[in-house]
Regions:
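Charged, low-complexity intrinsically disordered regions
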Residues: 1-195
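ASCE P-loop NTPase motor core, strongest for the SF2 helicase catalytic module
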Residues: 191-267
Length: 267
């Protein structure tokens, strides 16, 4: 319905079929002739993945910021007077960066300074670094005759990164615990990442005019020819004896007959 052009079924029923289904359902609501599109697209929808098949990592930009804020409040036990407005997670789609506001406010919380953080860097800062895919490093400033120098504090860095790993593990254990959150995350993941159906080329309609009647291509050979004609970039990853030579010759001749090419080169 979008292109207003005819498409072969193997082309239409491939690609982002979830997006195509949503579009078809919108058109079918006012134009009954598109209901057949809806029916066929429903048949080829990828099987939804459940929580056991999905890994949600800190920093994934498809996770809603409010879930990160909720994670902080539940795991770090953020006091209510900070949690309401001061300490929260945000994500910028422009810069692709995560930010946690009010990182330094919750100073007297042992979960923030000991369990999931250190005296040098608290849990909110460690979480922010983890969201931005950074391993936290702690530096000391050394004063000498040549001026000030920043030197890596290996001991404090090790403690900080251990605490950061504890946050990652806590997030992994927390993220799917709530049923509503789990269902929302699974639906989001499937909509974004589990929506593509590879095209299955169908060459049954190709007649191969001029081919000697002594040669009759098998279905997989016809499909391979269709892949070459319509796919533009094709790898014939067939085993020895599958008929690749016939596929290449037939595709080359048909391509020339249709005016798609003049000189064919196979690599």
């Amino acid at each position: 319905p979008v292109t207003q052009q005819w498409e072969t079924s193997d082309e239409y029923l491939s690609g982002n079929v979830r997006e195509k289904l949503a579009t078809a359902e919108t058109f079918a609501a006012n134009h009954a002739e598109y209901q057949i599109n809806v029916d066929y697209l429903k048949r080829v929808q990828p099987k939804d993945l459940d929580a056991s098949e999905i890994e949600v990592r800190l920093g994934a930009n498809w996770v809603k910021p409010e879930y990160i804020t909720q994670f902080m409040r539940e795991v770090f036990k953020t006091p209510n007077y900070y949690a309401r407005i001061d300490i929260k997670a945000t994500y910028s789609e422009i810069s692709g960066a995560w930010n946690i506001s009010g990182k330094s406010l919750d100073r007297g919380n042992p979960l923030v300074t000991n369990t999931y953080g250190t005296m040098r860097v608290n849990a909110y800062k460690l979480l922010e670094d983890a969201l931005n895919l950074r391993d936290t490093k702690i530096y000391d400033t050394i004063h000498d005759a040549d001026g000030d120098h920043r030197v890596l504090n290996k001991q404090e860095t090790m403690l900080a990164q251990q605490a950061q790993e504890s946050i990652r593990e806590a997030f992994k254990q927390w993220i799917f615990k709530d049923l509503d959150r789990r269902e929302d995350l699974c639906a989001t993941y499937n909509r974004i990442f589990n929506a593509i159906r590879p095209r299955e080329y169908d060459g049954s309609h190709i007649r191969f005019e001029g081919m000697t009647p002594e040669i009759s291509l098998m279905p997989h050979q016809k499909n391979a020819v269709a892949h070459i004609l319509y796919g533009n970039n094709t790898l014939l990853a067939h085993c020895v004896g599958a008929g690749k030579t016939f596929q290449m010759i037939a595709a080359g001749m048909e391509s020339r007959r249709l005016g798609l090419s003049q000189k064919n080169l196979y690599v």
